[in-house]
Amino acid sequence: MSSLGGGSQDAGGSSSSSNTNSSSGSGQKAGGTDKSTAVAATTAPTSVADDAPPPERRNKSGIISEPLNKSLRRSRPLSHYSSFGSSGGGGSMMGVESADKAAAAAASLLANGHDLAAAMAVDKSNPTSKHKSGAVASLLSKAERATELAAEGQLTLQQFAQSTEMLKRVVQEHLPLMSEAGAGLPDMEAVAGAEALNGQSDFPYLGAFPINPGLFIMTPAGVFLAESALHMAGLAEYPMQGELASAISSGKKKRKRCGMCAPCRRRINCEQCSSCRNRKTGHQICKFRKCEELKKKPSAALEKVMLPSGAAFRWFQ
């Protein structure tokens, strides 16, 4: 009986010990589950907070203000990261400090005009400054493009100024001197010359420059500048006289004067020599044996063109 009682006691002790062990094991398991649920409870708000959509941003009028860029629509304001970092502990505070340092470095790089690679290298260490690095990159690219456009515009203006200066020099070389032109010209021709110098011509492409359109010979082969036309049109050393202009504008095809030889370019009518006496008559002044211009082109047809200033102009084709 004693052995049976001891066996029962041993069985009861083992059962009690097993019960206590099982209860303690269950208590440890329960404690482990409680800890795991607590950890999950602590990590769940952070994941929910990260996955939750950003709050709607509204201005003072209550209108929702969303960024135009699609990649920035899910971005959060800086206050979200600062509040999350302050509740997270020392590591998050270090992250906020590094974010502030990265933002300050990016601003300094933008102000000093450094390269984009340096700004991206500073921003790679912090994931929260990706949007800032993108904004810095876009601003730097826009600034570089603006400087390139400004440089191209300056180069174009310089080339235009150089071409304009060269054209002005050519015009000044072919224009008559005012002292020589005003000595023997009649009043009407002097006024016409002043209008041709100071006013604009009827040609739209030559309106900005005082170029007489009579200097250009238009032929089927092209447009040429006549050297002898400078003398005959009165734009060179020996200008034409009023009588010659009236004689040419009468419509006669007979050649009266060449404008190149000494009798033709004589300004004052002496009324003694045959050349001066025949100026106002229908006789021919230039002779083939005296005038080199008529020897070169004896059968050339005489043509007449009315200039915008009112004076007649002729040249030999």
UniProtKB/Swiss-Prot annotation:
Zinc finger annotations (CXXC-type) as residue ranges: 251-292
Positions of the UniProt region annotated as Disordered: 1-92
UniProt keyword Nucleus, yes or no: yes
Biased composition range(s): Low complexity: 11-27, 36-51
Positions bound to Zn(2+) 2: 270, 273, 276, 286
Compositional bias per record (Gly residues), positions renumbered to this chain: 1-10
Residues annotated for Zn(2+) 1 binding in this entry: 258, 261, 264, 291
Motif position, Nuclear localization signal: 252-257
Subunit structure comment from the entry: Interacts with DVL1. Interacts with RBPJ.
Name the UniProt record assigns to this protein: CXXC-type zinc finger protein 5
Organism of this sequence: Mus musculus
